[in-house]
Amino acid sequence: MLLTTENIILIGALLLLVSVFAGKVAYRFGAPALLLFLGVGMLFGLRLISFNSAPVAQFVGMVALCIILFSGGMDTKFTEIKPILSPGIVLSTFGVLLTALFTGLFIWWLSGMSWTNIHLPLITSLLLASTMSSTDSASVFAILRSQKMNLKHNLRPMLELESGSNDPMAYMLTIVLIQFIQSSGMGVSQIALSFVIQFIVGAAAGYLLGKLAILMLNKLNIDNQSLYPILLLSFVFFTFSITDLMKGNGYLAVYIAGMMVGNNKIMYRKEIYTFMDGLTWLFQIIMFLCLGLLVNPHEMLEVACVALLIGVFMIVIGRPLSVFLCLLPFGKRINMKSKFFVSWVGLRGAVPIIFATYPVVAGVPGADVIFNIVFFITILSLVIQGTTVSKVACMLGLSTPMEKTGNDFGVELPEDIDSDLRDVTVTQEILDTKGDTLKDMNLPQGTLVMIVKRGNEYLIPNGSLKLHVGDKLLLISEKTKE
């Protein structure tokens, strides 16, 4: 088929449509949507589209990762992560470092075996391990939501904090090791200084620029409210770029800036959250498709045996060992079952594949082998861990039903209103015990019925309104004082 502008748009539309339907199928069957997105990209790459530009894939990945990390930061609430802040930070820093070290040493040992078809020196082995040392919990929580599950012992916020904040550490390890290879060796002091500068500058820039974004959103008077989300999006990219120019970690800055915005009062919060959520999904799909198009399945199969051994080592030994060592100082605060579950949720996602493009673009010897191994292990992790998360949670007795949030009416109150909205469905038991009119409901002091939904009809509430089984009442009440 001749690739005209119209045909490119058509192919792009088909890719997005197929991906959306694949995501729906994945959600229904409790499988990671990422796995199907990658599969769609690989399928189109085999027959219809020729794409082999690692720099373009890296650029798409960087843009997508900025949006994903910022959105993840906005969803991270200080009140939820405060009890598990210490273990979460330890896992996202030392956990990544230990996983990279253990896996890198195993790859180096494996490279020395005569029967393997890869022979990587120590630093390159550590580089390979570093690219896939961070976790991706976004797919995990999509699975838990699809099966209406939650987690005990504050595991959910701890895993969210780890997954949102460990990408910067893996990125720094990857960049430093690439620089080490290209410069024929760097001193320990240089490596340590690079880490310190990236962390300090990244954290400071994220905090300050996050504060600036809040100030701009609340003080800048824009006539068209649709421009507020676009203003925030520009801040996301500005934060990443300016931090990188100052030799800081742009990904860390973006995540912290997202946390600042998400935990403070801002204008048009609902519109901004809706915009960012849709944009996050769009760029996740584009990123996964792009990475799926980039891989050559034939080259990936050539390293399948070695990649399988490395992947099994990471899942069974590398990740659990690093988790248990990192959580050792916290003693009985985190029980054994929780440690086992955290070890199992070492899910690899798109981020390792993005980081695997850095050695390719930098021209590191053996970069193609690194990319293919990382891609294979990502698929392996999604198939083995991604499809069994809910089963493992149930087996360990850590799953609980997910509490309902929001209401079925799609109504939200501004942050400044100190009230809660919730909906109640009328049952036969309610009618038998309280009565069949609205005035018989005997609602608590300070609670009012705003509207009644009966089928597709909305009714204005009054005391004499006869209630039917299945009616939904939208209630507004004062927030509980803590």
Give residue ranges: language-model regions.
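The feature marks cytosolic C-terminal regulatory regions of anion transporters and related permeases
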Residues: 408-410, 422-423, 457-462
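Cytosolic Rossmann-like ligand/nucleotide-binding regulatory domains
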Residues: 430-482
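Short flexible/disordered coil segments
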Residues: 192-193, 220, 398, 407-411, ...
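Short glycine-/aliphatic-rich beta-strand segments at the starts of folded cytosolic domains
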Residues: 418-426
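Short linear loop/turn motifs
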Residues: 159, 403-412, 449-455
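Transmembrane helical cores of multi-pass secondary ion antiporters/exchangers
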Residues: 1-402, 406, 416, 429
